Amino acid sequence: MTGIELKSVAFNDHAAIPRRLSGEGDDVSPPLTWTAVPDGASELVLLCEDPDAPGGSFLHWLVTGIDPESSGMAEGEVPPGGQEWPNGFGRVGWGGPMPPPGHGVHRYFFRLWAVSEPLSLHGKPTVDAVHRAVRGQELASGTLVGTYQR
C-alpha cells in the first residue's frame, strides 16, 4: 500500500493548530494539501478526530466523496466534491478544537484515505464506524497530527 502525503500551511505535523481554526477562534477548517493518491481510487475520505477527548475519540470533521483527482483545499472550504457529515458537536461540517480547559494537550489526527468504493455511511457516523467502513477498501492513507490545548 502506498502512502498519501497530507500537509497544511497552517501548522506542521505534530505542532500546534492556530487558534483561528479552533472553536475559540473563527472555527474554520484548515487548508490542506495532499499528494500521491493512487490510481483506482473511487473517492477520498477525510476525518479529523481527537483521541484524547475524555469520552473517547471525538469526531471533529468527516468529509466523504472527495474527488480523487483533487490535491487540496483552502482554509474554510470543503474539499472538491466532498459531502460533510455531522461532527461530535452535532453540526454538519468542521468543528474546531475545543478540549476541556486544563485537560492538557490534545492531539487532532487528520486522516485522508483513498478508497476503492464509496463508503456506505448513514445518519451521524462515529469515528469507529468510519474506521470500520474504510477497512478493506483502503488503497492508501495519509495522516497529519495537530495539537491544541486550553
PLM features per residue range, with description:
Residues 1-150:
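N-terminus-centered regions that define maturation/targeting leaders and the start
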